C-alpha cells in the first residue's frame, strides 16, 4: 500500500525508526544492475523499471503517468558519467485487468521510441522460464527512500528521510506463500510473490516501486506494494510475479 508518494512529500518526511536506511541495503556497485531503469515524470524521478529488450521496459502499472521519460544506464541520478541514455515512450501499456485497490495485475510495458544502445552498462534483464522458489536468494534495487539518523536523533526532526542519488541494492529471499499470507491474510493472489529479509521486513520502500527483483540473474518480480510504514515493519514486500505474465508480455510486445 505504499504506492509511490510524491517526491516533495518524501523529502519532507521524517523517520522515527533507528537505523541507517529504510531500504536495508548498500549502494550498488556502479552499473552492476544494467537492466535498471529510472522513470521520470516532468523532470522528476517517479519509479524504477527494468529493460527487457532494446525497445521495451517493464514496470508496475501503478507507476503510470501522462508524461513518462526513461533513463537507462543510470547510477547517480544527479551526475552524468557517460553511459546514460534518455528515451521517450511511444506506448505505455498497463495490464488491462490492473486493479489499483487490490494491486492485482500490477504490471506495465513501455515501448521506447528509439531503441536502447546495448553495452555493458545497458543490458536487458532475462525473463524467467519458471517461477521462483521459497528461500531463493534475490536482489532488489532502486533509488527508493532511505533514512539518515544523526547520533542521538532517531525519532527527532533531525532524523530525515530522502531519496538517494545513487542506486541501492539489498539481498533478500523469496518468502513462501503460506508464510506471507500470515502477514497479509486474504490479500495475496497467485500473481504475487513475497520477498524480504528475516527480521528486517520488506527492504524496499517508497521510490523503489516498479523496480526489479532479480533472483539468480533472472527477473522474477516487480516492486509492487507492502506494509506501511515500510521503515517500521517486519512484513515482507509484495512483488508482481513476472513468470505469471510471460504470455501477456510476449503477446503485447508482438502486437505493438
From Swiss-Prot:
Tissue: Highest expression in the thyroid gland. Also expressed in the prostate, salivary, and adrenal glands and in the colon testis and kidney.
Occurrences of domain Peptidase S1 (ranges): 22-254
PROSITE patterns to which the protein is assigned, alphabetical: TRYPSIN_DOM, TRYPSIN_HIS
Propeptide positions: 17-21
GO molecular function: serine-type endopeptidase activity; serine-type peptidase activity
Signal peptide (from-to): 1-16
Name the record gives this protein: Kallikrein-15
Amino acid at each position: 500500500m505504499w504506492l509511490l508518494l510524491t517526491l516533495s512529500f518524501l523529502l519532507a518526511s521524517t523517520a522515527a525508526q533507528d537505523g541507517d536506511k529504510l531500504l536495508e541495503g548498500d549502494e550498488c556497485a556502479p552499473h552492476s544492475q544494467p537492466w535498471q531503469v529510472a522513470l521520470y515524470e516532468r523532470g522528476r524521478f517517479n519509479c524504477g523499471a527494468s529493460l527487457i529488450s532494446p525497445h521495451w521496459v517493464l514496470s508496475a502499472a501503478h507507476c503510470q503517468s501522462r508524461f513518462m521519460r526513461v533513463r537507462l544506464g543510470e547510477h547517480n541520478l544527479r551526475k552524468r558519467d557517460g553511459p546514460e541514455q534518455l528515451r521517450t515512450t511511444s506506448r505505455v501499456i498497463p495490464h488491462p485487468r490492473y486493479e489499483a485497490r487490490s494491486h492485482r495485475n500490477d504490471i506495465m510495458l513501455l515501448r521506447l521510441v528509439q531503441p536502447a544502445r546495448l553495452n555493458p552498462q545497458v543490458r536487458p534483464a532475462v525473463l524467467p522460464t519458471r517461477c521462483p522458489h521459497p528461500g531463493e536468494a534475490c536482489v532488489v534495487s532502486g533509488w527508493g527512500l532511505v533514512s539518515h539518523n544523526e547520533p542521538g536523533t532517531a525519532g527527532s526532526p533531525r532524523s530525515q528521510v530522502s531519496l538517494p542519488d545513487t542506486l541501492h541494492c539489498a539481498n533478500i529471499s523469496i518468502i513462501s506463500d503460506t508464510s506471507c499470507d500470515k502477514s497479509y491474510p486474504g490479500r495475496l493472489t497467485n500473481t504475487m510473490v513475497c520477498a524480504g529479509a528475516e527480521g528486517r521486513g520488506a527492504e524496499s520502500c517508497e521510490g523503489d516501486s516498479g523496480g526489479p527483483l532479480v533472483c539468480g540473474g533472472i527477473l522474477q518480480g516487480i516492486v509492487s506494494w507492502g506494509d506501511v510504514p515500510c521503515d517500521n515493519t517486519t512484513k515482507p514486500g509484495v512483488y508482481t510475479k513476472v513468470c505469471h505474465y510471460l504470455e501477456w508480455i510476449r503477446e503485447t510486445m508482438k502486437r505493438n
